[in-house]
């Protein structure tokens, strides 16, 4: 996001996300950028360069700390809001889990090291595993 939006000024907004479900063994890592049509190719190049940089250099401790903080704060919020707590409890019943599973998960997340995260990212997210989709008004290209 920082590279495409602030540094290169190519995108109105860019994000990446990881979705890991509990009901199946699949996960999704995705990224997107909103940009002017004339910037599409440069945004793709920037995305690939940034992904290759992470694969080569790895995530930093600060990036891991920020991501971990966000996940753990969201988990606390899930327990503080009635609707979210009900969803968590209901899912735990379906998954035959207790809230102790959630605590153990959060403890495991707390103990992750940058080296572990980088090893897993390199194993599962090489550039050749990505599908790149471009959408928009092609008449403006």
What label would you give each PLM region?
Residues 2-111, 128-136:
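M16 family metallopeptidases and their MPP-like homologs
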Residues 139-141:
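Short, intrinsically disordered, charge-balanced linker/junction segments flanking boundaries
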Residues 19, 121-124:
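Short proline/glycine-enriched turn/loop segments at secondary-structure junctions
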Residues 107, 116-122:
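Mature hydrolase/peptidase catalytic cores and their serpin-fold inhibitory cores, especially
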